[in-house]
Amino acid sequence: MTAADHQHGTAHGHERFQGVSGLACGATMLVGRGSLSRLVASLAGVGPGDRVLDVGCGPGGAAREAARRGATVTGVDPAPVMLRLGRYLSASGSGRNIVFVEGVAEALPVADRAVTVAWAISSVHHWTDVPAGLRELHRVLAPGGRLVIAERLSRPGARGLAAHGLTEAQAAETAAAAQAAGFAGAGHETHRAGRRTLAVVRAHRAADGPG
């Protein structure tokens, strides 16, 4: 499954995540996202000693939630303006346990088996190659590591901003792609976070898995 398989036809580019408009987008991402970050961290079972990878971290709200729970965190995002904002907002307290790195899901700047938890929140619909991104996530997760993907639940046929997410069918396709990428126990479900209904995909790397 590539971005072309999404109902809106193509991956959403990152052009708007630049300059002043990028800062504005980053600020918008911080509004009302606390419940989403807490939900994903809870679904992933994040706790002290975990090494968390946040793919498409934006300004780092979910990364800071993981750090508050005692994890060390690597936030990866292709937009330099998001990384700068994330570093600024994470400069004190537990935020000092977060490292922000420029990169994309399809070529993660992370070593093999380096993390115990990986998640992608509202970012998979931006990926240019979903199977490649999932293979990369499998590569960087340690055996037994947990994966959570969370996207807004979209309606079939939605257009514009309403299509920024996954339909139930696309969530099922993403779970199947995760299984094909080597993950075990891949499945999809819906959750509520504040006013949002989310399509969530969860899986794990088998404790004795190859690769």
Predicted segments, located by residue:
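A short SAM/SAH-binding and catalytic strip from SAM-dependent methyltransferases
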Residues: V117-V130
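A short glycine-rich, Lys/Arg-flanked "PGG" loop and its adjoining helix->strand segment in the class I
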Residues: P131-P143
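A short acidic, Gly/Pro-enriched loop at the edge of an enzyme's catalytic core
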Residues: E106-V117
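C-terminal alpha-helical "lid/dimerization" subdomain adjacent to the S-adenosyl-L-methionine
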Residues: A4-R33, R146-R202
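C-terminal lobe and adjacent flexible extensions of AdoMet/dcAdoMet transferase-like proteins
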Residues: R202-G211
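Conserved alpha-helix/loop element of class I SAM-dependent methyltransferases that forms part
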Residues: L30-D50
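Class I SAM-dependent methyltransferase SAM/SAH-binding core
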Residues: R51-A107
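Short glycine-centered segments of the SAM/dcSAM-binding site in methyltransferase folds
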Residues: R51, G145-R146
